[in-house]
Amino acid sequence: MSRYLLMITLVFAGEIIFGLPFHTARFFRPTLLEAFGFTNTQLGDVFAVYGFMAMIAYFPGGVLADRFSARSLLTVSLIATGVGGFYMATYPGTWGMALLYGYWGVTTILLFWAALIRATREWGGSASQGRAFGILEGGRGIAAALFATLAIAVLAWYMPEDVTLASDEERRTAFRGVILLYSFAAIVTAVLTWVLIPPLKHVGDSSRSLFHGAAVVTTRPLVWAQAAIIICAYCGYKGLDNYSLYAVQVLGMDEVKGATLSAYGAYIRPFAAVAAGFVADRWSASKTIGVSFSVLLITYAMLSMALPEGSGLSVIYANIFVSFFAVFALRGVYFALLEENRTPSFLTGAVAGMVSFVGYTPEIFFAPITGRILDASPGIGGHQNYFLFLAVVAAIGIFVVAWLLRLQRSDTRAQWPRKPALDMEPETK
């Protein structure tokens, strides 16, 4: 029972910490833009600050995850992130939001991300990596959908019955309620994390062991291939942030219905991630990823051409939900490549930090690029160009998977160093 309680805790912590910086923009983008008075370009630049700070934090975060208790690292991160929401609720300007997102780039990554990945890998064991990461991603999807549904209810509560008649003040009040919901959720989850995660940590016997992983992983081709896969997959995930805006500007929905469409998509996440995890364990994580990229290439190409008229509307909805499934399938298994690539367990944090450092660089470039794509051609033209950009990224992902498969045919064990002297000790209070 405690084993599954641990995974449930990791699931909720792993999703709630990203609620403030990402859920607010993914599910409520039209409302956020109106409430803050931002353009797509300005919001994209704010996200670029987050991405820059996160990129700096990923690699040292991996080293810390190999040294310190996941319980301590996750708890501090959740509290620090939740506190930042109280500042967001004051509606700072673009500079204030840029500083806040830079702060979140540190609080959500430095002490959190690699620790989460390491804890999940250890939970799964060598035989069930696809299942472990599939359950993590799928469970995070359930948590995201549940909190998005609750947040939509909060937004609707404060909005007038006819959302199109909402005043600026009503919209700001409603969105403030959404922000505070995610803030308190992060803090409450921090308390649960401290109570439910065992207080164990890994302790090295010298300063050499602290930086040993950082020194060796950068020369491993398999690490770079996995990082490139994450870049392409994460662009697809970031692409989901546009769907609520697409629903409003192209499909003619109001803000609440646009947010609801994205929330419905989030409910696909657990099914897609868990299914992909089981397939990866029985078949291959890399081949599962290749199939997912192929599906995305087709769906993005269709969305770049489809018009919301007659049967075209059905084509759009079908491809939207298929793309949700393929993106979440990718996220469910790309960290299972740690085991498929035979990554030594003592280097899990360092490799996770390295592939995240490189793989999540779309946090820096994706939103500024796509924000400018949308603003350059307002309306359906901008959104079609947006999907065309995503199709190109998916095609690149297919080629990267082919490269990874070729690397895996070599003797991967020979590419890794031997384990330095490390001990396991319980955390002292």
Model regions: which residues?
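Juxtamembrane intracellular "pre-TM" segments in multi-pass secondary transporters
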Residues: 1, 198-226, 422-429
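Extracytoplasmic gate region of multi-pass secondary transporters
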Residues: 25-29, 144, 148, 221-273, ...
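Helix-to-loop junctions at the C-terminal end of transmembrane segments
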Residues: 56-69, 272-285, 374-375
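Cytoplasmic membrane-interface "Motif A"-like loop-to-helix N-cap segments
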Residues: 67-78, 281-295
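Glycine-rich segments within core transmembrane alpha-helices of 12-TM secondary carriers
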Residues: 131-156, 356-367
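C-terminal membrane-cytosol helix-exit motif in multi-pass small-molecule transporters
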Residues: 151-160, 183-203, 400-405
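C-terminal transmembrane helical hairpin of 12-TM major facilitator-type secondary transporters
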Residues: 284-337
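A late C-terminal transmembrane helix in Major Facilitator Superfamily
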Residues: 342-378
